């Protein structure tokens, strides 16, 4: 891989302003000490069957060096620190795409400074396409594409279909240059290039350490980035990014703006906030309330007829009678009763028995209006107005003056949300008055008790049937 004359250099001073640069510098100081000839990690060439593995060291060597030279007492801490450095690509396993450190005999190799993250690499997809394409031209077992790399290559080939010929030519030229290198040098450079892309295009499921925290990025003195091509590709084949203009100088806020800021922060201070303990208690109570309705946690009653021989579920559906769990759920809140068709029907029957069903019928009519085709909306708005809100309406509802005036204005330009304010007002009235009366009513209690009795009778019949056999 051609490294050119900018070996280990940064572009346009971006490196000094990168939010991660402090971390990079600390890691590179440790790497420099690791590579010291006298006190560093011993690098050796290992003889394998019919081949040699040059310039490697083991994972246990790294852990022992960190414990000895960085005054680390816990081996787990040393392993964690080494894994972080490996994830940033400063050293890498020679036979694995996952950049992690293992405290064993796994072989590792140092990355060349040209590929260090402190050089502020931001490689393009075209660079990655050249690299993958070049790998397919080299008939080496160690250079075969992994599954995720093959998928990436196919995706890039579709994305850059018009300029794929040029990308192929670039890859072919790079492959010819690599063939002219010494065998050992080529093996080392291939592994270092692979490790570079494992950092910038990591294995699915691995963390991308090159991503910049948005909070850190906002504190940069110069927020614009300069993209840098790995292979020196020309602008005509690179993806065009928007030109970043210098940030304009900020002006001191005016008196009006300061007043607006003060008003905003006063509103924020007056906002109602819940303590985390209250939120946790609320979440726990919600979970305990709905746990029996989660089939992953509690077996459903009645059981799924497709998984068992019990046909009770089908019998209940055929009889149109709700199960005990279904009836019990209506008591959790008015939303539960309204979103269940049978619950709405029972709620409406109860209100009709008390001659106060107009509120619920209005609420249901507005819900139906929201789902109507747009051509039917104006006529349906007039029907709802004449039935519930017009002077002398047959089913007049009780609205406050503010909601009525706003609805009157909305009717002049009918739409799906003409009655939004009126519906919200009626919903609050039902939630505070009609719904509690329905839950306390004998109709709901009888329905709930009937389900329990039915369940008891069914269990008794099953018991007697089993005993008879």
UniProtKB/Swiss-Prot annotation:
GO molecular function, one term: G-protein alpha-subunit binding
Domain G protein gamma: 255-316
Top-level taxon in the UniProt lineage: Eukaryota
Tissue spec: Detected in brain (at protein level).
Keyword Cell membrane: yes
Entry-linked PROSITE patterns: DEP, RGS
All residue ranges annotated as the RGS domain in the record: 333-448
UniProt membrane topology term: Peripheral membrane protein
SUPFAM superfamilies to which the protein is assigned, alphabetical: Regulator of G-protein signaling, RGS, Transducin (heterotrimeric G protein), gamma chain, Winged helix' DNA-binding domain
GO cellular-component term (any): glutamatergic synapse
Region Disordered, annotated ranges: 236-255
Biological process annotations from GO: G protein-coupled receptor signaling pathway; intracellular signal transduction; negative regulation of G protein-coupled receptor signaling pathway; regulation of G protein-coupled receptor signaling pathway; regulation of postsynaptic membrane potential
Cell compartment(s), UniProt: Cytoplasm, Cytosol; Cytoplasm; Cell membrane; Membrane
DEP domain: residues covered: 37-112
Pfam families given in the database record: DEP (PF00610), G-gamma (PF00631), RGS (PF00615), RGS_DHEX (PF18148)
Phosphothreonine modification, residue list: 243
Processing after translation: Palmitoylated.
Modified residues (Phosphoserine): 229, 241, 434
Subunit text: Interacts with GNB5, forming the RGS7-GNB5 complex. Interacts with GPR158; promotes the GTPase activator activity of the RGS7-GNB5 complex in absence of glycine, in contrast GTPase activator activity of the RGS7-GNB5 complex is inhibited in presence of glycine. Interacts with GPR179. Interacts with PKD1; this prevents rapid proteasomal degradation. Interacts with RGS7BP, leading to regulate the subcellular location of the heterodimer formed with GNB5. Interacts (phosphorylated form) with 14-3-3 protein YWHAQ. Interacts with SNAPIN. Interacts with GNAI1. Interacts with GNAO1, GNAI3 and GNAZ.
Name this protein carries in UniProt: Regulator of G-protein signaling 7
Organism: Mus musculus (Mouse)
Lineage, broadest ranks: Eukaryota, Metazoa, Chordata, Craniata, Vertebrata
Gene (UniProt): Rgs7
């Amino acid at each position: 891989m051609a490294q050119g004359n900018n070996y280990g250099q940064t572009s346009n001073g971006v490196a000094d302003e990168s939010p991660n640069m402090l971390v990079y510098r600390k890691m590179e100081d440790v790497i420099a000490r690791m590579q010291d000839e006298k006190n560093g990690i011993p690098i050796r060439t290992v003889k394998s069957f019919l081949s040699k593995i040059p310039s490697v060291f083991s994972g246990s060597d790294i852990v022992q060096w960190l414990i000895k030279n960085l005054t680390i007492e816990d081996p787990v801490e040393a392993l964690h620190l080494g894994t972080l450095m490996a994830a940033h690509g400063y050293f890498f396993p020679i036979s694995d795409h996952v950049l992690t450190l293992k405290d064993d005999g796994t072989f590792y190799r140092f990355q060349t400074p040209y590929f260090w993250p402190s050089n502020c690499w931001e490689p393009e997809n075209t660079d990655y396409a050249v690299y993958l394409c070049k790998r397919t031209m080299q008939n080496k077992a160690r250079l075969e594409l992994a599954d995720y790399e093959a998928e990436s290559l196919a995706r890039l080939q579709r994305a850059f279909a018009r300029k794929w010929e040029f990308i192929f030519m670039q890859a072919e030229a790079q492959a010819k240059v690599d063939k002219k290198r010494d065998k050992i040098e080529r093996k080392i450079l291939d592994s270092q290039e692979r490790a570079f892309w494992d950092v910038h295009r990591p294995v699915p499921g691995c963390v991308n350490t090159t991503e910049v925290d948005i909070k850190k990025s906002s504190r940069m003195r110069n927020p614009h980035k300069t993209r840098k091509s790995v292979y020196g590709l020309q602008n005509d084949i690179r993806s065009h990014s928007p030109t970043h203009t210098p940030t304009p100088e900020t002006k001191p806020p005016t008196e009006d703006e300061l007043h607006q800021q003060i008003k905003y922060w006063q509103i924020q201070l007056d906002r109602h906030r819940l303590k985390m303990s209250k939120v946790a208690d609320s979440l726990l109570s919600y979970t305990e309330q709905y746990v029996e309705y989660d089939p992953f946690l509690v077996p459903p009653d009645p059981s799924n007829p497709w998984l068992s021989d019990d046909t009770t579920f089908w019998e209940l559906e055929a009889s149109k009678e709700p199960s005990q769990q279904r009836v019990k759920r209506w008591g959790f809140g008015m939303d539960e009763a309204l979103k269940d068709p049978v619950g709405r029907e029972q709620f409406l029957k109860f209100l009709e028995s008390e001659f106060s069903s107009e509120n619920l019928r209005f609420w249901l009519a507005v819900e139906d209006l929201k789902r109507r085709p747009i051509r039917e909306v104006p006529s349906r708005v007039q029907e709802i107005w004449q039935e519930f809100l017009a002077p002398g309406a047959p089913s007049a509802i009780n609205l406050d003056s503010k909601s009525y005036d706003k609805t009157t204005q909305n009717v002049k330009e009918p739409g799906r949300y003409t009655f939004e304010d009126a519906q919200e007002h009626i919903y609050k009235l039902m939630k505070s008055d009609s719904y509690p009366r329905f839950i306390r009513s004998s109709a709901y209690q009888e329905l709930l008790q009937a389900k329990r009795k039915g369940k008891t009778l069914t269990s008794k019949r099953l018991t007697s049937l089993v005993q008879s056999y």
